[in-house]
Amino acid sequence: NLDWFKEVMEYPSYEEMFNNSFEVTTSKLLYLPYLKGERSPFIDPLARGALIGIDTQTDKKQIGRTVLEGVCMAFKHCLVALCEDMPKQLILTGGTSRSRSFCQLFADVLQVEIVLLNEQQNIGLLGVLTSCGIEKKKTTNHENKENFIPNKNLKNYYAKKYTTFQHAYPTL
């Protein structure tokens, strides 16, 4: 989704794409990020993406913000299907973790603390060990680089938007 958006909007870098998209603080739009079908939490290889709520006042920045929100909501959709209870913390790695704004958006949409680690080497192993119930303290000496606390003022906003997100796919 992010590669597609960067290419279509002709951003020269991800940094510029993120910076532009976060100039807007909220968006009335909704984005379903099913550009190549969907495999989780539902299986539908024919599912397609959608940008809902667009009008003549919609600009590139609003669309960017909405695409990023849609990516976060799709992750939340998977997490809700997978977990009985939402976790209190998630470790974020990869390219999007380089954007502080995206990390904060992720925390706000999920209403979960997002943790970045100083050392990301062997992070996949950490995930496997954690999912097996082996305590992080016993296996690694990773330290937190930064924590992103969810903005409680956005809790209701994103809860309503997520409910709309959940209902949007089946109605298309």
What feature does the model see in each segment?
Residues 1-93, 98-172:
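Active-site core segments that coordinate phosphate-bearing ligands/cofactors
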